[in-house]
């Protein structure tokens, strides 16, 4: 289950925008957006059976490599990194797992007309004071072709959270 706690522009039974080839989104009033934003809460249980344990100071370099493997272009990866890095780089370690099934099941996405390519990157992460051994996660991306929809986000799992 997902509850949207904040959206921009306002989410009224969905967003109605037209996507231009350059990525600009235009609503029915002619207002242009570079992206749509939503924040929410879910009771989804995130899977940390595979992932990475990264030193805080190595987080930017790790994310640059990981996000490229997951299919984000340079601009998208830059936006992702500048959003998350201030919360992560000072930690001794970050345990990171990119969620696929659990995220896409919790946060359904419907786009009309259907895109040729959908890239959804969702990072669950947790601060750690010590190195944590974790099976390495394989990172892959679909081939970008035609009309491509990109969504990225993440969540910090606080110590003591059961997710």
Role assignments for model-derived ranges:
Residues 1-163:
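Protease-labile, long low-complexity intrinsically disordered regions enriched in Pro/Ser/Thr
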